[in-house]
Amino acid sequence: MFEKLVAIEPVSLIPSAEKELFQYVKEVVLFDDIPADDDEIIRRIGNADAVLLSYTSRIGRAVLERCPSIRYIGMCCSLYSEESANVDIAFARTKGIRVLGIRDYGDRGVVEYVLHELTGLLHGFGMPMLHDEPVEITGLKVGIVGLGVSGKMIADALA
């Protein structure tokens, strides 16, 4: 259990998720604006042992050195690689701070959206039809640009 969690900027939690935080932490502080600089981030974190941030702010070595209470940082944004992260994960590791990001969130919704739009285009549901006659998805040859997680899931759904 954590003592204090601070979301240093808006992290887009739904109300039920905000309530659920109290299962893991005694005190929760959620900021609804983006901090201007490292000094503001340090002030917001204070003595918190858990921190949440989105993609707009950065927690670098200077912040980590001045916030010795941090044990956990939750990145409420994509974490593609340690090198591209907006948290100095390598330095955090040397301080025993666990940093977790979100991977592959929203991918199922992307697949559903693509299939919905493709069906609409092929059958003219809510938009002009691509061809003169409706076309079935089954057996359709489709090119997908990018075969990351979403691209692979779309390919699987169309297979």
Task: Mark where each language-model region is.
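Rossmann-like dinucleotide/phosphate-binding beta-alpha-beta segment
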Residues: 1, 133-159
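Structural motif
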Residues: 7-12, 32-33, 54-56, 76
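Short, well-ordered alpha-helical microsegments
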Residues: 14-15, 38, 59-61, 151
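A short, Lys/Arg-enriched amphipathic alpha-helix followed by its capping loop at the start of a domain
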Residues: 15-27
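Rossmann-fold NAD(P)-dependent oxidoreductase module
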Residues: 20, 113, 153, 157
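Structural alpha-helical scaffold elements that stabilize or flank donor/cofactor-binding regions
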Residues: 21, 43-44, 63-66
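A short beta-strand-loop structural module common to alpha/beta enzyme folds
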Residues: 27-36
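Phosphate/diphosphate ligand-binding glycine-rich loop within oxidoreductases
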Residues: 49-129
